[in-house]
């Protein structure tokens, strides 16, 4: 975990450990978490020890050996979407995570937050955004399906095969 001040719900090692333990075989890209330490005398923060996976994490640039392969971008992009869709297929209740989060009203809360952030940040009127927000608010599906979400899903929270970055090895964080 990062050391120093963090947002109250960010990097909750107890929650992360619990989720990784419960995902087990239901989502093979989740590394196993073997142990949780909550003793502040060890590192000063909670941490967990998880399975080592071998692969690379791509940040802003492809590693030198992978550059110059234009087909790679599309394959990696499709893989990112497929992996997230696979995670969403895991039923939280089936893996013992039915009590995680607050699924009721989730979409409404997200739209409300997006709208508030938009109105606080916009420096000019953009009618299309306001229209889109109204449309989304009117189109929230009912009933909503409960699914596991990764709150920081992005390329550098995926570990991929070093020889073929379109092959996922692990989902991190």
What are the roles of these predicted feature ranges?
Residues 1-148, 162-167:
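ATP-binding pocket architecture of kinase catalytic cores
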Residues 148-150, 155:
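Catalytic-loop of the protein kinase fold
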Residues 173:
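Conserved active-site aspartate in kinases
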